[in-house]
Swiss-Prot record:
This is Cutinase 3. It comes from Fusarium vanettenii (Neocosmospora pisi). The gene is CUT3. The keyword Secreted applies. Belongs to the cutinase family. Residues 1-16 form the signal peptide. SMART domains: Cutinase. One of its GO terms (biological process) is carbohydrate catabolic process. The keyword Secreted applies. It is an enzyme of class 3 (hydrolase).
Length: 231
């Protein structure tokens, strides 16, 4: 998406980009990261992974893992083995369009239903699997809304959730409603305005790569091992 189109859409949702923001840096986020993973939806129940990671990308990001998801996936696979963890991005009805950020829950109802369906699949396909989740920007709002809306029996199977640039951080008091705070890790950079109730995109919103390569997956790995043991 070109910078002009992006700023026009943001203006339509009562948001604006700082004029000092570098065009190329913004486009690197919006156009980069085209990885798609559908291990859960394509997987066979006879060969379930012990761990299933469900992730929602940020607005306009390509693939279903966007820019941050692949880094988390790589670290999880190093910890649990390629066959030990399934990676599943949220696609389908989740279009990651900019306008949906202005909706009451920070994303569309259709997107929430899509992610809810992914959380529900393992209940029949891989009932013994441990679930972990994450999301970036609009995807963080989507992950939070989906986890909040789950039946408690399925929600209790989620060992941990990581949220980057959480667009509902202020509104939800830095947590996911109806979900334990100790199983939630929110990454909000200093100066990331979306974490303080705005939809203005500033440079700190685009610099969560180091967190996705280190602290975020490490948190998830720790939470999984607390449930399943260190094996």
């Amino acid at each position: 998406m070109k910078f002009f189109a992006l700023t026009t859409l943001l203006a339509a949702t009562d948001s604006a980009l700082p004029t000092s923001h570098p065009v190329q840096e913004l486009e690197a986020r919006q156009l980069g990261g085209g990885t798609t993973r559908n291990d859960l939806t394509n997987g066979n129940s006879a060969s379930c992974a012990d761990v299933i990671f469900i992730y929602a990308r940020g607005s306009t990001e390509t693939g279903n893992l966007g820019t941050l998801g692949p880094s988390i996936a790589s670290k999880l696979e190093s910890a649990f083995g390629r066959d030990g963890v399934w990676i599943q991005g949220v696609g389908g009805a989740y279009r990651a369009t900019l306008g949906d950020n202005s909706l009451p829950r920070g994303t569309s109802s259709a997107a929430i239903r899509e992610m809810l369906g992914l959380f529900q699949q393992p209940n029949t396909k891989c009932p013994d699997a441990t679930l972990i989740a994450g999301g970036y920007s609009q995807g963080a709002a989507l992950a939070a809304a989906s986890v909040e809306d789950l039946d408690s029996a399925i929600r209790d199977k989620i060992a941990g959730t990581v949220l980057f640039g959480y667009t509902k951080n202020l509104q939800n008091h830095g947590r996911i409603p109806n979900f334990p705070a100790d199983r939630t890790k929110v990454f909000c950079n200093t100066g990331d305005l979306v974490c303080t109730g705005s939809l203005i995109i500033a440079a700190p919103h685009l610099t969560y790569g180091p967190d996705a390569r280190g602290p975020a997956p490490e948190f998830l790995i720790e939470k999984v091992r607390a449930v399943r043991g260190s094996a």
